[in-house]
Amino acid sequence: QISESENITKNYADNLINSGDIEIGILKNSAKDKIGISLNDLTKHMLIVGTPGSGKTTFSVSLLDRLWKEFNIPFLVIEPAKNEYRALIQSIPDLQIFTPGKSFISPFVFNPFVPPENVKLETYKSTLKTAFAAAVSMSTPLDKIFEEAINNCYSDFRWLDTYTSKDRGGIFNIADFIQCFQNTFDEIGYTGDAKNIGRAGVVRLRSLENLFDNYYSIPIQDLLQKPTVIELAAIENSDQKALIISLLLLSILAYVNSNYVGIGSLKNVILLEEAHVLLDATSNVGQGDANPSVIARNLLKRMLAEIRSYGVGIIVADQSPRKVSTDVVALTDMKMVFRLVEATDKQIIADSMNMNEMQEERLARLKPGEAFLFFNKLDSPEEVITPDYRIQNNIDVTLSDQDISELITYWNDKMEKLKPYPECEEIVYCKKCCCYERRILAKEIARRIFVKNFNKGMKDFEVIKGVFAKISRLTKNELNDEEFSQELLACVKVHLWRRIVYGTGIGVNKRIIHNSLRKS
């Protein structure tokens, strides 16, 4: 193919100029020629970088929107810092949006201890260990305790290494795992510094309870079969964000390895926005600790290397190529580079794209929407002008929480899956769904009642009898202006029973708990 501009004639590979599946933009040196790519080019992965306001996100939105509407290629966006992809629902009405940290909008119900479909436990246990290590620094012996606790917990719930989630192993959640971690630690009998490290591990795990406080888990295939956005902006803790991202990426990799056939044609696109949130997970790293950022970088490198043959393209997006590391930059074949001003960033990109000196200097002077494109079908980077897709297609920069809560549909036919605990099945008021506002209130009331009446070393069952004999009055005493109801009381009982089971030394038979709740 040939493109002619003012005084330049260039030869290009086929299916690039005024052709291709996806149009990237207009060649800067041509008044009319457009450059495009084929779908399968994306299986070799893509890097999109640029400073805020340079057009990076607008381009990403346009790419994803066209992939779904024109080619029925589903995408998954993992968005750690902003809420800019939610507005795609204006163009894609069945867009799935999940908002961990803002469960009142669209809960992200994820139980990391449930293996993805058709993934054997033996494989998945290593996934769990890698994901936690990529997000949380684990001093020795914490890493060994964690590994042993994983083995013990699955064993306690009657799993075998050959089982998948369809077999008969019992489902457990983060509270069960913390209890198993504590028991494993106590059985080993560490002393001194090792004992303090183990206690710190329990505290660290308890900080994750609100993230994974459920037994059901959204199937990985649900996230891959339709356009999906997972927003993490409401989670303030960077380690927690990194953990969710690590668990998601590794669960996807395990699922794809077990369920996809490697024929190479594009099936899915995964966009990891603000990738440095995962790759910079270095908080509280001490001497002798496994460095989470190194593990996370290796995780992403492994995914980039393994998943392409299954037709899954990964797009890594960030403001700075320096923050995603040169090795990740090197593993993405296609590069779309908007305005960059920092010297190291420009140097990394220039080296990776075979730029000449003029092109490198030009990076800092690019206007919004202008970018350099480079991949294996080009001999040198091409400067392109990308369309202002959001304005052209009436897609807002973002939408309010209220707007999104009214538009999302994922949970409409799955309301019963929002019940967090097995004990909820005993409550007659909760057969079809779970009222989130009531659950939050009941959980806090149960916490207050527990703190005032129980302690960790308590073993006297008579205390439980005394508390439950006056549970209605105790619940009413903790209300502010909220209305008391039998529905609320039943929910308080569920949360209080769970606190007793996991927070005291009182052994309680499950039958007693279930009988108590059935009377609610």
Describe the predicted segments one by one.
Residues 5, 25, 40, 49-51, ...:
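Generic beta-strand/beta-sheet core signal
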Residues 30-31, 42, 82-83, 237, ...:
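Short acidic loop-to-helix transition motifs that present clustered carboxylates
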Residues 62-305, 309-312, 366, 371-377, ...:
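P-loop NTPase motor domains
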Residues 5, 367-520:
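Conserved P-loop NTPase motor module
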Residues 1-18:
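An aromatic-glycine-centered, glycine-rich loop/turn in mixed alpha/beta architecture
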Residues 54, 62-65, 114-116, 287-288, ...:
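Conserved ATP-driven motor cores of ASCE-family P-loop NTPases powering translocation/secretion/packaging/pilus
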Residues 16-101:
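Glycine-rich phosphate-binding loop of nucleotide-binding enzymes
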